[in-house]
C-alpha cells in the first residue's frame, strides 16, 4: 500500500502547476515562521529540496536572517544521516540527486530545537511515507525536539503506520 501511495503522490508532485506550487510554498513558509516551535528555536534543521518538494530555501534564508543556526542533512551510511551546518559553498550533489554538505561537523541531536521533516505523503496522525530509505524514521526515533512538515493538499493520504514509523508533531498543508 505504501508503495502505491508513494508512486501516485510522486507522480502528482511531478506534474503540479509551478506557479501554484510557488505560491503555496510562500504561504507555508510564512506559517512556519509564525509557528511557536520555530519562534523559540535557535537551531533549525531542514532539507535541501528536490525540484518537486516544498522549496525550503525561503525558510533557510529567513532563519539565517533571524540569526538562527541552520542545519541540513548528510547521508553518512546505509539508512544513517546527520545534520551539518548549512553552507552553500560546501554543497555537493549526493547519490540520491539532492544537495548535501561535502563535509562538516555533525550537530548533536540534543542541540537541534526544530526539525523540518520532508515526506511524500502524511496521514492524519502525522505519520509519513518518505522515499523509502528510512533515514528520518531512524534519526527521529530518539529525537526529543520539535518536528514540523510542510506538504501540499494532495499529499494527505490515509494509511496504516508501521512499528518503526515515527510521526511528526505538526503537518502544515496548502
Name the predicted role of every residue range.
Residues 2-4, 11-15, 110-115, 123-127, ...:
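Surface-exposed, charge/polar-rich loops and edge strands
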